[in-house]
């Protein structure tokens, strides 16, 4: 629990149980942590995920063993697919009564024992069962590092009951340190992008959720203010630059995309896509995607962009570091005629569209796009809103 505090965690979401008796006691004793108990493990796991997204930091979910742990698996999958750094900590039977440790080919040693690590290995960045109490510091160091580094995602630590109650001397524990070489932005890549944007008649920035994960919103805003290049965004990147800015044209894609954003995308001749995996929901038929554009992708995940060839050039870099370097380059301001054309599309194909709002009012109905627009005007910038997936994916962007 102390290590979670050191990582900046303030809240732990949980459903207690006999498999985490000692962990729950440790949580209660750690005054810097606030425990939030939910009615169900799925609620705790999704709360931890939402917490991580809201704070752009670590979320923590604590659950017991067996079906208590499997109740959190759906949220782990969601965190894996949405790049959310959540630490899942599950309780477990005594070490020598677990199939994971003994390797005995039986289904279970008894009530509530299950090999959760095998279940979650394919949907986490790191999953481990602790075998020795003295390894806890190193395993926590590694898990926390991996959750927050590179393309973020969930990690899972399974703690047997007897090891939870083991006596250790924290100062004497072995710690883990990465030997990974920090990712560097290549000057040649930055220069090539600056030249491409400057030469283009119709340049466009395509921003994804990776902008937020990298903490790059401010440097992106600085760059756009300087270059006046129109911006479109994926539904996951709606807050990467901000839809209310004058150069923000709209969301793109078949789900949640705007007509203005898609028009800009299809007419651009140079696209710099940053922090997006260019999913098929966004590109549609890749042979018809942005047919006039030279596409450069900057992303933290190399593997994601090996699945299909959507980009002409891929740059492996952190979004914030890349934009900080690009901001210092002499990028020519975008062609004013092109910028005004994009702004014109945004104005003509506004969201919500006025004729639809009027027709809904005549039928005494509520237009969801209009509702979203008004709600956004009334809420504080840091307000939290709980909605279903359709509203968040289709209406809000």
Regions found by a protein language model. Name each.
Residues 17-19, 93-94, 159-165, 209-211, ...:
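Glycine-rich beta-alpha junction loops
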Residues 21-101, 260-262, 267-279, 394-397:
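Thiamine diphosphate
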Residues 25-32, 100, 118-123, 167-178, ...:
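Gly-rich Lys/Arg/Thr-decorated short loops/hinges at beta-loop-alpha junctions or inter-strand turns
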Residues 1-8, 18, 23-30, 346-397:
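Active-site diphosphate/adenylate-binding microenvironment
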């Amino acid at each position: 629990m102390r290590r979670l505090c050191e990582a900046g965690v303030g809240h732990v979401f949980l459903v207690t149980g006999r498999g985490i008796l000692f962990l729950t006691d440790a949580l209660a004793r750690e005054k810097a942590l606030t425990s939030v108990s939910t009615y169900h493990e799925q609620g705790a796991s999704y709360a931890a995920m939402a917490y991580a997204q809201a704070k752009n930091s670590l979320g923590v979910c604590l659950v017991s063993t067996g079906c208590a742990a499997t109740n959190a698996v759906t949220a782990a999958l969601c965190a894996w697919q949405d790049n959310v750094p959540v630490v899942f900590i599950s309780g477990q039977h005594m070490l020598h009564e677990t199939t994971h440790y003994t390797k005995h080919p039986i289904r279970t040693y008894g009530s509530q024992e299950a090999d959760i690590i095998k279940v979650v290995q394919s949907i986490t960045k790191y999953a481990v069962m602790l075998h020795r109490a003295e390894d806890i510091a190193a395993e926590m160091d590694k898990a926390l590092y991996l959750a927050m580094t590179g393309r973020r995602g969930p990690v899972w630590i399974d703690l047997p009951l007897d090891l939870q109650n083991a006596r250790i001397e924290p100062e004497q524990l072995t710690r883990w340190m990465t030997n990974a070489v920090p990712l560097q932005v290549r000057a040649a890549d930055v220069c090539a992008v600056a030249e491409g944007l400057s030469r283009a008649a119709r340049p466009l920035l395509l921003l994804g959720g990776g902008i937020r994960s990298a903490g790059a919103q401010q440097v992106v805003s600085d760059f756009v203010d300087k270059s006046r290049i129109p911006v479109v965004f994926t539904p996951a990147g709606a807050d990467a630059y901000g839809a209310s800015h004058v150069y923000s044209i709209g969301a793109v894609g078949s789900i949640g995309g705007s007509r203005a954003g898609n028009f800009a995308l299809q007419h651009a001749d140079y696209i710099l896509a940053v922090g997006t995996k260019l999913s098929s929901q966004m590109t549609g038929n890749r042979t018809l995607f942005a047919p006039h554009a030279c596409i450069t992708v900057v992303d933290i995940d190399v593997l994601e962009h090996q699945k299909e060839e959507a980009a002409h050039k891929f740059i492996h870099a952190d979004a914030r570091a890349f934009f900080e370097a690009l901001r210092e380059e002499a990028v020519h301001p975008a062609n004013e005629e092109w910028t005004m054309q994009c702004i014109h599309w945004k104005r003509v194909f506004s969201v919500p569209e006025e004729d639809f709002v009027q027709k809904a009012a005549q039928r005494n109905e509520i237009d969801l796009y209009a509702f979203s627009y008004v709600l956004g005007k009334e809420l504080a910038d840091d307000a939290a809103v709980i909605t279903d997936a359709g509203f968040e994916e289709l209406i809000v962007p």
